[in-house]
């Protein structure tokens, strides 16, 4: 007679906590899955969800870091929407990604393309 013994009871909370620390994220994978599935009408793998989550976390960290720097240069201790807008406009890569983002109470976008000054000076000199 062979008796098979299995682990009974609840799982050890110390072991579960260590595994979940690496997967913890601000953005839930289920939310990303719902958005991607609604837009693509395809099945989404877990690796794709983790990759998109990492990209979103990177963008959030870049925007918050830039907004913190803008707020500190203004002498403020509180990050406001205008600081986020200025951070996106001042960073070339973030501006390339988010040039059409509208941030409520963010003020006007103050990005001037490098070629804008050259074009305006040529127009003024051709009138003579």
UniProtKB/Swiss-Prot annotation:
It comes from the Eukaryota. Belongs to the histone H2A family. The nucleosome is a histone octamer containing two molecules each of H2A, H2B, H3 and H4 assembled in one H3-H4 heterotetramer and two H2A-H2B heterodimers. The octamer wraps approximately 147 bp of DNA. This is Histone H2A. Keywords: Chromosome, DNA-binding, Nucleosome core, Nucleus. It is found in: Nucleus; Chromosome. Core component of nucleosome. Nucleosomes wrap and compact DNA into chromatin, limiting DNA accessibility to the cellular machineries which require DNA as a template. Histones thereby play a central role in transcription regulation, DNA repair, DNA replication and chromosomal stability. DNA accessibility is regulated via a complex set of post-translational modifications of histones, also called histone code, and nucleosome remodeling. Disulfide bonds: none annotated. One of its GO terms (cellular component) is nucleus. SUPFAM superfamilies: Histone-fold (SSF47113). Pfam families: CBFD_NFYB_HMF. One of its GO terms (molecular function) is protein heterodimerization activity. The keyword Cytoplasm does not apply.
């Amino acid at each position: 007679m062979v008796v098979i013994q299995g682990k009974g009871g609840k799982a050890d909370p110390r072991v579960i906590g260590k595994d979940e620390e690496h997967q913890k994220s601000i953005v839930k994978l289920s939310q990303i899955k719902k958005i991607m599935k609604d837009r693509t009408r395809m099945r989404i793998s877990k690796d794709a969800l983790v990759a998109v989550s990492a990209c979103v976390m990177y963008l959030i960290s870049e925007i918050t870091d830039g907004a913190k720097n803008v707020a500190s240069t203004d002498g403020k201790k509180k990050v406001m929407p205008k600081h986020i807008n200025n951070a996106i406009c001042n960073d070339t890569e973030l501006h390339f990604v988010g040039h059409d983002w509208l941030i409520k109470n963010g003020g006007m976008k103050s990005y001037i393309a490098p070629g804008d000054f050259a074009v305006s000076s040529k127009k003024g000199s051709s009138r003579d």
